[in-house]
Regions:
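Glycine/threonine-rich flexible loop motifs
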Residues: 113-122
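Hydrophobic/aromatic ligand-binding patch that stacks against planar heteroaromatic rings
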Residues: 127-131
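Short acidic, Gly/Ser-rich segments with clustered Asp/Glu that frequently serve as metal-coordination loops
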Residues: 24-33, 221
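Glycine-rich phosphate/pyrophosphate-binding loops
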Residues: 132-154
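Short, Lys/Arg-enriched N-terminal segments with co-localized hydrophobic residues
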Residues: 2-13
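A cross-family phosphate/adenosyl-ligand binding-site feature
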Residues: 15-18, 29-96, 100-101
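Electrostatically charged, flexible surface regions
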Residues: 153-267
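Short, glycine-rich nucleotide/cofactor-binding loops
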Residues: 20-27, 118
């Protein structure tokens, strides 16, 4: 796959430039499987956290000096790590590593789903939203499996197809894709569905513990409840019924449908 760049009396064919990051760290199995899956589609620059940064969403480092460390380099592939957040990694890569504007930003493959309200907490989606805010075609991939040795091989044909399509056709301005995969055997996949985010809530989120030295401390945990389990148009329903869930996600979070109901707020 090549991109044509036109100049006076000159046509230059260039491979697409793909920027990849995650929130599980550059050594995670998911991101390394992703690199292999999309390697043939362009030149790859990876800039990912030096360790796990799950739950960082769109956070960036305003008061911490950031570092970049080259971990691996070969023809068409560079892998960098940073002490920053997932969004820091994208900002750093766009400023310091990419020779031109990438044709695609990919977040993932995440160890664990990023469906429903998890979208708002996800560092993987932070990567994708940052790309989207820079008007770069951006996609996030996540598997409903938190294990470090998760099997990502069933995802390959779907990821390859989605990446090819986005590179060829692009996405609407201000829209990125949040793609979640169910934890099932490859033969059990039933297809792909376009979905909306399910409404869900987290409860029992804090576990209080007592330290032997006399003070209390807390672990963030929690239990997720799908508030609309029967709605077949949601990502949770699709995942629970063996479908790959694709949720088009907007950079613009304005609730346009609420304008009429809230007109009385105008002065």
């Amino acid at each position: 796959m090549f991109i044509r760049i036109f100049a006076p009396k000159l046509i230059i064919l260039m491979k697409p430039l793909i920027l990849i990051s995650n929130d599980d760290g550059y050594q995670a199995k998911g991101i390394n499987c992703l690199i292999k899956m999309v390697r043939e589609y362009g030149d790859i620059i990876v800039c990912a956290p030096d360790s796990a940064r799950s739950g960082y969403a769109c956070a960036f480092s305003a008061t911490t000096p950031l570092r970049l460390t080259l971990q691996h380099k070969e023809e068409g592939l560079e892998v960098w790590s940073s002490n920053g957040t997932p969004v820091d990694c994208i900002k750093l890569a766009l400023s310091e590593l990419c020779p031109r504007k990438p044709d695609l930003v990919i977040g993932g493959i995440n160890h664990g789903d990023n469906a429903s309200v998890n979208t708002h907490y996800s560092g993987t989606m932070g990567v994708t939203m940052e790309g989207c805010m820079k008007y770069i075609n951006s996609v996030a991939f996540s598997l409903c499996d938190y294990r470090a040795d998760a099997d990502f091989s069933p995802l390959e044909p779907y990821i390859r197809q989605i990446v090819q399509r986005v590179l060829n056709e692009g996405l609407p301005k201000g829209v990125c894709l949040n793609v979640n995969f169910p934890l099932i055997e490859e033969k059990e996949y039933r297809g792909v569905r376009l979905c909306r985010m399910a409404y869900g809530t987290w409860g029992s989120e804090v576990a209080k513990c007592h330290h032997p030295r006399g003070y209390d401390y807390y672990w963030m945990m929690g239990h997720y409840t799908n508030d609309e389990p029967e709605r077949e148009d949601t990502d949770n329903w699709a995942l629970n019924h063996g479908y790959v869930a694709i949720t088009p996600t907007r950079m613009d979070v304005t609730a346009y449908e609420a304008f009429e109901a809230l007109k009385q707020y105008e002065l």
